[in-house]
């Protein structure tokens, strides 16, 4: 294992799938039964407000989660559905919820089309079965069917009145369309997958962009939110210091990746074998994707080039300039 220290992560130890947990006076959470190496215990869908409700990240297409949300929202009106990004553990149930509650969807935009030249081939090892027994294609699967009713830009006020004020905060990096959502009344940022309390975030090219991700982390660190509520894992009530630590961690990881290339390890998997030697083997594939993100950034920064002048794909070889 490298000497790159990780920030202090936290666990979410007490919860029940499908139950409604009142986590603050204005926020409820329902956790989907889709645990995996990407999703931790599962997708946390947030219900904001009472009576007139805003839903954040409806979650995956699981019957059990749909039924839990239907029960949680019985007798209430959904005024808006906010989606952080278009991975399959976040947005698919938006279509059902939109039809069921006649509520508009908001997001930065649809996911851009795939880039066949850069996309790695499908890997069956990235499929997991949730503890529910329902097959789940984990986060790296993309919901290309989702398109919002209303596309937002950074700073848009999407909900106002009824005791709720919510704004869009565009945070590209994990995906190009990733957007966090604020709740002004509780000085809260719903951070999606941009910041997670239990782990670092996978930043996988081509749509994931490490340079944009680090810039977005700095943006969030400077906002002054009191609490972060990620879609996976526990809240962080040390928002600014924790996100600043994530920036430091990413920069240290980048330096370690560059050092490994200079030492003769020229591919993402070779680098992972060293930098993640103490990490469980099943996490090496997602780790390789973030290492790939660092390699692409280092190419863009002029620190590395691709052997043979090829595209900086997951299988490419890199050398220092």
Model-flagged regions — what are they?
Residues 1-9, 259-321:
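C-terminal regulatory/interaction regions
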Residues 14-76, 180-192, 197:
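Conserved beta-strand hairpin/beta-sheet module of binuclear metal-dependent hydrolase folds
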Residues 23, 100-101, 224:
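Short, structured coil segments at secondary-structure junctions
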Residues 26, 69, 232, 257, ...:
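Residue-level signal for inorganic ion chemistry
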Residues 41, 60-163, 187:
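Active-site HxH/HxHxD metal-binding segment of metal-dependent hydrolases
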Residues 53-55, 60-62, 140-150, 164-254:
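Metallo-beta-lactamase
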